[in-house]
Amino acid sequence: MTLDRTFPIFTVRWLAVHGLAVPTVFFLGSISAMQFIQR
């Protein structure tokens, strides 16, 4: 019962972390690339 309640929370947390981390890394990478191209 305990694992059944903890698993969905872990999944939502994992999805939220990756959903925010992936675009952030992509955004920072594109910004740094633009600055390198301008110079």
Swiss-Prot record:
Predominant subcellular localization, coarse grouping: plastid
Cleavable signal peptide: none
Annotated disulfide bonds: none
SUPFAM superfamilies: Cytochrome b559 subunits
GO molecular function terms listed in the Swiss-Prot or TrEMBL record: electron transfer activity; heme binding; iron ion binding
Keywords on record: Chloroplast, Electron transport, Heme, Iron, Membrane, Metal-binding, Photosynthesis, Photosystem II, Plastid, Thylakoid, Transmembrane, Transmembrane helix, Transport
Location relative to the cell: Plastid, Chloroplast thylakoid membrane
Cofactor binding mode and count: With its partner (PsbE) binds heme. PSII binds additional chlorophylls, carotenoids and specific lipids.
A family per Pfam: Cytochrom_B559
Cofactor(s) listed: heme b
Binding residue positions for heme: 18
InterPro entries assigned: PSII_cyt_b559_bsu, PSII_cyt_b559_CS, PSII_cyt_b559_N
Function summary: This b-type cytochrome is tightly associated with the reaction center of photosystem II (PSII). PSII is a light-driven water:plastoquinone oxidoreductase that uses light energy to abstract electrons from H(2)O, generating O(2) and a proton gradient subsequently used for ATP formation. It consists of a core antenna complex that captures photons, and an electron transfer chain that converts photonic excitation into a charge separation.
Classification via HAMAP family: PSII_PsbF (MF_00643)
Protein name per the record: Cytochrome b559 subunit beta
Originating organism: Pinus koraiensis
